[in-house]
């Protein structure tokens, strides 16, 4: 059985909170050395390498103690000692015990790694696939060349489209191989199979024209080209010796400075308030500029734009464009990154691209079945689609994995209000406030609105005072104005109308419908309702479920 050897194998570092764990066996906290014995160090490295996934007790015992005669009690003592070294308390839990399963490191971790040395380069020519549709063939050829070009840092040099696009006959192929002498080439033929297609692929070593591999790949209708690229990339990895790509390698940040900026941005994103999201946007944009080849900042930026849209503090159309751009960039860096695939799944389903969205979610879940990120995105997707019971179940799974995720808690509160009613929503809101979201302004504004709807005006006014004025914008402002209407009836209408007049693109924001209904009446609200419905407004699907709009259904 292999034994864990804590001898340094690289210059990478693990960074979490104010700790830095080096591969030379040292642990620093706020730049001061913390003593960590070899066994505790080995367990910590394995948990950090697992990147939030569960590590079984048997795995830890096998890798750290090897063939030594030990039992689970030794591991339990080691975990206890490690928690003391990390100064764990009730508010700062680093290691989570999952009874019957193992342990998981449950805090954000960033791996800092200097750029890896360039491996030996292998040149690849991708020939245009034989297809009935010439235009489709050219488009697919371009997509595959572009996708596989992303693997250049790992030893794969792909000839450009301009050189290979006209290479279709045997004569053309032989001339290209003779003139440019690539190491390998890929050819393919697409054969219709009902509504789907079969792609027959050959990988050939040019020296001696030796056929290395043949494979038939079924392409389902509407399946994104990136999935075909990923399958081809995996085939190349199996067939070409010396290729060394690792999906985790290109997600690592390359300096302590960019890591610290990322962690600050991620922290602000997780706070999930209007002010914190604006701060996250600045920090994560800065991080992308510092580490343009790292995946994590692009994913966080995409989620940030989506969150700002949900909160009504960023133009919805522009935010969706930005979110998609950053999610696509992440998949260009790694076609198999589950978080990026989950984000694209959410974005596609918001835009009613249900088949593509479903495929992306399925792929993300296969790659990372126990991921709080994927559970959150999928639960959000189900909520938008009106599948409230399934959405609630999925969000609960997310919160089980990450109880401190503010955005998931807020989403659960909306779902509860829509699905089981205001009394359950008030109880859940109180529960969330007593746990991790006691000062969150969006939660407070929702509780103020719920209490006002129930006629508990004094308690609602008391809660309103706890909301910072700098946070009263977007959806928080809408919630508080609706609460003011519940408390003051007609006297609140001038303020609501003034707010609606100041809002830009009111005709593109279904989230304002509850205020429009009370301020301008049922006829105008119904006109807006029908407009959103006829236009298939992407956010209307979420707001049409609101119990306050039952008159318009």
Curated annotation (Swiss-Prot):
Output the InterPro entries linked to this UniProt entry: OmpR/PhoB-type_DNA-bd (IPR001867), Sig_transdc_resp-reg_C-effctor (IPR016032), TPR-like_helical_dom_sf (IPR011990), TPR_rpt (IPR019734), WH-like_DNA-bd_sf (IPR036388)
Which GO biological-process labels does this protein carry?
Answer: phosphorelay signal transduction system; regulation of DNA-templated transcription
The 4-aspartylphosphate modification is found at 62
UniProt-recorded Gene Ontology molecular function terms: DNA binding
User: Per UniProt, which keywords does this protein have?
Assistant: Activator, DNA-binding, Phosphoprotein, TPR repeat, Transcription, Transcription regulation, Two-component regulatory system, Virulence
The induction comment states:
Expressed in response to both environmental conditions and genetic regulatory factors. Transcription is subject to complex control and is stimulated by the SPI1-encoded HilC and HilD.
The keyword Transcription regulation belongs to this UniProt entry's keyword annotation: yes
TPR repeat residue numbers: 372-405
The source's superkingdom equals Bacteria
Q: Which residues bind DNA?
A: 11-107
Position of the signal peptide: none
**Known role:** The main transcriptional regulator of the Salmonella pathogenicity island 1 (SPI1) gene expression. Activates the expression of invasion genes by a direct action at their promoters and also indirectly by increasing the level of invF. Also binds upstream of prgH and directly activates the expression of prgHIJK operon.
**Under which name does UniProt file this protein?**
Transcriptional regulator HilA
Organism the protein comes from: Salmonella paratyphi A (strain ATCC 9150 / SARB42)
What does UniProt list as this organism's lineage? Answer: Bacteria, Pseudomonadati, Pseudomonadota, Gammaproteobacteria, Enterobacterales
Underlying gene: hilA
